[in-house]
Regions:
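Active-site and donor-binding regions of nucleotide-sugar-utilizing enzymes
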Residues: 23-28, 45-141
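Structural motif
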Residues: 14, 82-83, 226-227, 269, ...
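N-terminal subdomain of nucleotide-sugar transferases
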Residues: 1-46
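A donor-sugar binding/catalytic signature common to diverse glycosyltransferases
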Residues: 84-93, 305-351
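Active-site-proximal region of nucleotide-activated glycan assembly enzymes
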Residues: 109-205
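Conserved catalytic-core segment of nucleotide-activated headgroup transferases in glycan assembly
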Residues: 36, 181-286
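Donor nucleotide-activated moiety binding/catalytic core segment of transferases
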Residues: 63-79, 276, 281-326, 332
Length: 360
């Protein structure tokens, strides 16, 4: 963690930790805070949360999100916490906590998967993503002095460990669901549904290794700098629900394909990149095939899975996204970028500010 972020995080004395990512991360954060002389209490909202906090002192919340501010008020009278921590600021319970904390002058810090990936975790006071307090004024960044590149500790992510934590979280959460009858998860909370999706994701990945083995060489050679890359996000991404005008990823696909068919150069192609975490949940091939026919695009639209994002960006002419962090990667690759939702990096001078029709 960089020094200034660490200073902000540790400037409190008494911490209340709400829901973290699936796994022991927030339990570990609480223990780390205590090792540095702070007080830290975890709040659990379902059986999965409780399982990963089982070795700690925790408080359980059994009521609805609307009743959460009152619960926080009563708790604050007993445990005078000055800082609330959570993972993601768009979950219903976290939204209520954020509003309440702001009204009481209590610090609200949200963790998020890193804006820069891999190797980074994001934590910001007040909110993350489009709620970030990072300035949108380009002059602010132009006036910043050159800084040395930060030291980055190389961490190797473990897919199996992540799957294991998710499996236990869902199974135990489902098993004890009757103890938390008012809890509503921000995503599907059925371990059986998620297990089916994971199995489907696995065999689809193996299938795509065969069916799409010739796609990347074609993009790198024949279509180099001749295609626009449209990045998809997971179907239930809170960034779409809260920070865009789209109700569904399919609406975004439709708008991009329609605009491309009307205004893009006839010799150009559109590559639509499926999100790898959505592989087992959604498949947009029938929609893309239908829209290609409806908009007269023929074979100019290429739908891809699991191809390496750096290579796709390197050989793309330009990039379109709703508000994915892949947009930051596009900027790093010095690609023209159109943001269709609200994003912290959608800044004049960095991204295209005009209409999508003119972007092509």
């Amino acid at each position: 963690m960089q020094g200034n972020a660490l200073t902000v995080l540790l400037s409190g004395k008494k911490y209340l930790l709400l829901q973290g990512p699936m796994g022991p991360f927030f339990s570990d954060v609480a223990e780390w805070l205590e090792s540095l002389g702070r007080n830290a209490v975890n709040v659990v909202f379902n059986g999965g949360d409780r399982f990963y906090c089982r070795h700690r002192h925790y408080l359980a919340y059994y009521q609805t999100p609307k009743e959460f501010p009152g619960w926080l008020r009563d708790l604050h009278r007993q445990y005078d916490f000055d800082t609330i921590l959570c993972f993601g600021d768009c979950r219903p319970l976290h939204k209520e906590a954020k509003r309440w904390a702001k009204s009481k002058g209590i610090r609200f810090l949200a963790f998020e998967e890193g804006y820069l990936r891999p190797q980074f975790i994001t934590v910001e006071e007040g909110g993350v993503n489009a709620y970030s307090s990072l300035p949108r004024d380009p002059d602010f960044y132009r006036k910043l002095p050159d800084m040395p590149a930060p030291h980055v500790e190389n961490l190797t992510p473990s897919t199996m460990k992540r799957i294991g934590h998710a499996m236990w979280y869902y199974l135990i959460g489902w098993h004890y669901r009757h103890e938390f009858p008012r809890y509503r998860h921000h995503k599907s909370f059925s371990p059986w549904y998620e297990a089916r999706c994971w199995v489907r994701a696995y065999w689809r990945k193996q299938l795509y290794k065969v069916t799409q083995r010739k796609v990347l060489p074609r993009l790198m050679n024949e279509l180099d700098q001749r295609y626009y890359l449209a990045v998809l996000q997971v179907y239930n991404d809170s960034q779409i629900r809260n920070h865009s005008n789209y109700n569904d990823v399919r609406d975004y696909i439709n708008e991009v394909m329609y605009s491309f068919s009307r205004k893009a150069p006839k010799e150009s192609y559109l590559v639509i990149k499926h999100h790898p975490m959505d592989r087992g949940h959604r498949l947009y091939r029938p929609l893309i095939k239908r829209l290609s026919k409806e908009y007269g695009l023929g074979e100019r639209v290429i739908y891809v899975h699991d191809l390496p994002m750096p290579e796709l960006l390197r050989h793309a002419k330009a990039v379109v996204t709703i508000n994915s962090t892949a947009g930051i990667s596009a900027l790093i690759h010095n690609k023209p970028l159109k943001v269709m939702g609200n994003a912290l990096y959608d800044i004049k001078g960095l991204t295209y500010q005009g209409h999508l029709h003119q972007f092509w």
